[in-house]
Amino acid sequence: MRIRCSIGTAKVLGLNKIRVDALPTTAYLMVGERCRYNCAFCAQARESGARADLLSRVSWPEFQGESFLRGLAHPGAQAVLQRICFQVVQDKVALEDTLEWVKAVKGKTNLPICVSAGPRTLEEVKELLELGVEHVSIALDAATPEIYAQNKDGSWTERFKLLSESAEKFPGHMATHLIVGLGESEEDMVRCLQTMYDKGITVALFAFTPIKGTRLEGVKQPIMSHYRRIQVAHDVIRTGLARADCFQFRDGQLTDFGISVDELQERRGGEPFLTSGCTGCNRPYYNETPGEELYNYPKALTTEEVEEAWANVRAARDKREGV
């Protein structure tokens, strides 16, 4: 069997010699190719014209399974990695292949495993967890049913129902992805975040990233002040500092966190702006290219980066560029 690794993961496993600014602390693996679904933003979508080795801005070269497993077991890789994450493309056999890969990986390492897949039933979620997977992620991507319908196949309501039922049946083991910048308001996203954490669901927050060959290739990324406010709201909610009910909004834009921004900066520093999701997940340059201001920082921020991030949080009312 062959498997795709993110290019940074391949570096950690000794499968390439590229230079990177930040090593991934999770081994990111992709199973399957060319999804049966047609998400407007995804390089792997059914009708996408993007390169087959892309997921977001990251390239995922393919390797022989034996080479990958040797690299994973190497002490150098084990010293860097904190987690293994399978990104499962929804073709006809990828979920079944993932079960086999989970078994193979567990024979080489004790690192926690998460699987971002599209299980259709509670039984499929249970099967993954019984194999020893720590987290199963069912990606909503969109904060509302309306935004979902504009950008994805299927039903937000049905997917949310399965995610909620799974979180109730398997507490502490469910996660989801949410993408900022698909057209939702800040209030939409914040209320969705609160709902997820009320149900015990871990959230990985992404900035929309236009990929050439996808239906949304011409749409701009969210401006930084918009994304920074959502990151702070996410941090406040997940740490229990305040609830979304305590926030204030004007025309859908977040204007008050229920705690002063000065106090939040003093208490939280750069934490809100680090990559979110499962413990040990840092996703270097998933939404950016090196040299740009980072939406999600893969490592601790410098003093200057912390100040810049909070300055964006304080920025006056704004609009998406180009709107």
Please report, for each region that a protein language model flagged, where it lies by residue.
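General structural feature for long, well-ordered alpha-helical segments within catalytic domains
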Residues: 64, 97, 101, 124, ...
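Alpha-helix N-cap and loop-to-helix initiation/capping positions
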Residues: 60-63, 151-158, 184, 188, ...
